[in-house]
């Protein structure tokens, strides 16, 4: 169900990225009680942030999480848009 929700959310996501996002959602205890749509979105955002941006490097350099999120938001939205996602990051995402 999460895989189907993810494909509706991000129809152009590459297959290897899709599997990583789905695996993250399935393995996350916190997402196990979420709806498939919510689990797909939260896993997708976390995957893109931690895997495809400089977010973790910014944290290592001493930026707080909110600042690091701000600096990677535009890149994340570019990736999400390229994968066919219509939704954009909200300030709390």
Where are these regions (language model features)?
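Amphipathic alpha-helical packing elements
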Residues: 42-80
């Amino acid at each position: 169900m999460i895989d189907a929700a993810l494909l509706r959310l991000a129809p152009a996501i590459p297959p290897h990225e899709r599997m990583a996002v789905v695996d993250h959602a399935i393995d996350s205890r916190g997402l196990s009680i979420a709806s498939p749509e919510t689990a797909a979105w939260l896993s997708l955002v976390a995957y893109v942030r931690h895997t495809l941006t400089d977010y973790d490097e910014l944290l290592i350099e001493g930026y707080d999480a909110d600042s690091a999120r701000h600096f990677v938001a535009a890149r994340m939205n570019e990736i999400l848009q390229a994968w066919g996602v219509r939704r954009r990051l909200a300030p709390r995402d």
